Amino acid sequence: MTTPVAFEYPAAAAGLTEPLVRQVVLSFYEKVRGDAVLGPVFAAAIGGDWDPHIERIMLFWLTATRLKRGYHGRNFMPAHLKNPAIRPDQLPRWLELFRETAAGQCTPQAASALVDIAERMAETLAIGLKRRDAAP
């Protein structure tokens, strides 16, 4: 009889923990709020009450890293596509802030695991936004 091999997600193997992911997410969104490019887009979409959004995003990231199961929301794409203020040219800035935050708070291995997830999200969102913007 063979022993099943447990699948270990790269983020967990990279040394990510729930407190670290929470710290990165909170720090990242503080930067976003103060950013000249992204701040106004997020402020218009979220309004004045950031707490519910932050908690939803926190659960998303904890689920994406497989540190916790708790995000039961929809795919992130529809909410972003319906907002015309979100444009593909903003994604490099979003990634720049995320990379900066992860690098400043994580080991290189943990930062790489988080940035990998962020890059895949940005790539997927860029494709969707370009299709949206090309639609007649």
Cite the ranges covered by each PLM segment.
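Core of compact, soluble alpha-helical bundle domains
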Residues: M1-P136
